[in-house]
Amino acid sequence: MITNTALEYKGNLFPSKVVSYEHEGDSISFNTDNNVILKVTILRDSLIRFRFTTKGYFSNDFSYAIDKSQLHGYNFLNVSEEENHFEIRTSKVKCKIKKADLRLSIYDLNDFLILEDELGFHWEESYEYGGNIVKMSKSSKDGECFYGLGDKATQMNLKGKRVENFATDQYAYHKDQEPLYKVVPFYIGLHNKQSYGIFFDNTFRTFFDFCQERRNVTSFWSEGGEMNYYFVYGPQMQDVVTTYTDLTGKPELPPLWVLGYHQCKWSYYPESKVKEITSKFRELKIPCDAIYLDIDYMDGFRCFTWNKDYFPDPKKMVAELAEDGFKTIVIIDPGIKIDKNYWVYQEGLEKDYFCKRADGPYMKGKVWPGECNFPDYTNPVVREWWAGLFKELISDIGVKGVWNDMNEPAVMEVPNKTFPMDVRHFYDGNPCSHRKAHNIYGTQMARATYHGVKRFVYPKRPFVITRSAYSGAQRYTSSWTGDNVATWEHLWIANIQVQRMSISGMGFTGSDIGGFAEQPTGELYARWIQLGVFHPFCRTHSSGDHGNQEPWAFDEEVINITRKFVSLRYQLLPYLYTMFWQYIEEGIPMLKPLVYYDQDDTQTHYRNDEFIFGNHILVCPILEPNAVGRRMYIPRGEWYNYWTNEFAIGGREVWVDSKFDEIPVFVKAGSIIPKYPVQQYVGELEFDELVLDYYFKIGKEKSEVYEDAQDGYDYKKGRFSFLSFRTIGKEKELIIQLHKEGKYETPYGKYKINFIGLPFKVTEVEIDNEKIEFSAVDFELNHFLIVEKGFNELHIVGE
């Protein structure tokens, strides 16, 4: 017999019958007779928010994840009451809510069932902390697949997996390890060629189960807070990802140099070592734009200080590096050393800016400097103070970017590796414990850092990178996948992680090339470089405890492969820049898993390795040693082997030969790929032509090229160049139409168009309806034309 009252009532609780409802504007509220309220808000015809409370009223509606600058609106909304349910209809979907228990189901307008509750919303009282453990379970359809969730070191398709979201410092993590550094509680479901998304905007520790515990049930739950989630309808995965990215926000355009190659190590010091590294890059003609300084540049690991023994004149050093094309990036951690003679600590203490325990004393934890206090970045006053601390680094010394690390937050020598859960946070006027603030701590640090860097680097654009992040962090920062390991398994993990981050809204992501922990072989490093140059963020980083990891740390062959692939990245910078422009303008991910590219082809649903880089390039890394090629899946359509220009029909798995200095790369037929000449750093060269590689296709295709001044904010005033190419290929004819938008005039005056795969001999060329003189013999030999920029239509006729 149970006599303990708490135990007697412990267990799952459920909404009871609906007793009333109200419809006001874009929101409909349903009230049950046991005080549960479900508030349904229609943000768009395909974006619906579901918010539950069990106490008869809602707490303050606040989210760090949602981009409040986005305007929402729907085209159609109708609410009707039926005998057993309510129906909410938009121009895209209809939602039925049962009167008996608030369980809901969502259909398209053809009555196809997209998603339905199993148990639906339920909860359990949290007797240890107060509040509720909130839960949701959904029925899963046969063959349903699941994607997203950000930084997860597991298969692309999450079917059969259970994952945990709690930002954690996981040094040398392994495949399937949970949790990791980032928290992105957003997933994409796909069944019967229909995609939808769920974003569970809850910053407490959350869990997702994709049919692991029960075969046909998907569930998600949190240790506290509200059951507050957004449903996003596709039906294409592209629509789901774009809508979610709009909801949580997009970054501003980075300066072009940020898309170059970066070199980092824990740590490069003293100054002579830094210059030795940068000089070697220039000597070997391996392009590089950024050099990083890890924690050893500081005085006793105190943030915003310099070790003058290692770096006696940092301003002079940074200026000299800049003359050679290197931008200096420095690390800044959240732990502020407890030292009464340290000016940052003095200010934080004087102004009461550090996090406190529940009963009053400051949160104290050991990090690199020893005992530290930690700023409460959830307080806007503290964020403003933190932003101001960057003045000397950026304005005076000339540092170009900041790297935030250890901001999960990580604390050494404690069992849970982070703050105690009783630490209090301001949470922008919604005071709470660390249970609620933990997952957004790193994002708010990155936010404060971003505003500081942006303020002092102006009129140039800022660059910030963070290890820990929550949904929406992409508005302020790039990221990397944390302390990985120099193993072939981690090369496989890195490939999937960056793809997954890309479709989870955080596209500006890369991995530590070569692995942070342990030491790669030359072969592994070369294969990682070959993958890493196709990631949005491209940086080699390693632990100094495990040997050297510069390209020349191996042999001449690895040096040559590194030069070849980094040079290729620099050639593709206009293509990369265009990818980024489409990401910030339209929410289109820069990397596209094959399932995103073609969800109707079931062969793509379980592919991990292959991905689309931008819109037109297919990449498949080599992920095992001693490989002379690999099997890979070429998606449906027509493609050209980048290295051989051989034509390939997709929709099938094929063997592709691949030498050590190559990986399988294919270009979509009909595409135009823009290229710059190889530069050792962005801005090194002036050039008078843009190379355009055109890959012939019978039919139509679109390609785009975005350019601007490569830094600064004139692009926001219309001073950009956006070229839209439309190609029409026929058996003996090719038409290239060009439309330009924007007021920016590129410094080059010509296009060099390389024609690949032309099936006919060219006999006539017209530009804007005027025939031009050209040498058929030379064209036959070289297959290119040099034309003045600014044409509207290029017409090529053959026989």
For every predicted segment, state its role.
Residues N34-N35, E81-N84, R89-S91, A100, ...:
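Short, well-ordered loop/turn elements at secondary-structure boundaries
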Residues K55, S63-A65, E116, P287-T562, ...:
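Aromatic- and carboxylate-enriched substrate-binding clefts and catalytic-loop regions
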Residues E788-E799:
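Surface-exposed interaction regions enriched in Ser/Thr/Asp/Glu
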Residues M1-W257, C264-W266, E271-S279, A290, ...:
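N-terminal accessory segment at the very beginning of proteins
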Residues Y107, F112-D117, E164-D176, Y181-K182, ...:
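Internal mixed beta-strand/loop scaffold within catalytic domains of large alpha/beta enzymes
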Residues Y450-P462, A469-W480, I493-Q497, M501-S511, ...:
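Catalytic core of carbohydrate-active enzymes
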Residues D33, P179-L180, F220-S222, M237, ...:
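Active-site-proximal structural scaffolding
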Residues V40, K92, F186, F281, ...:
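Conserved, mostly hydrophobic/aromatic
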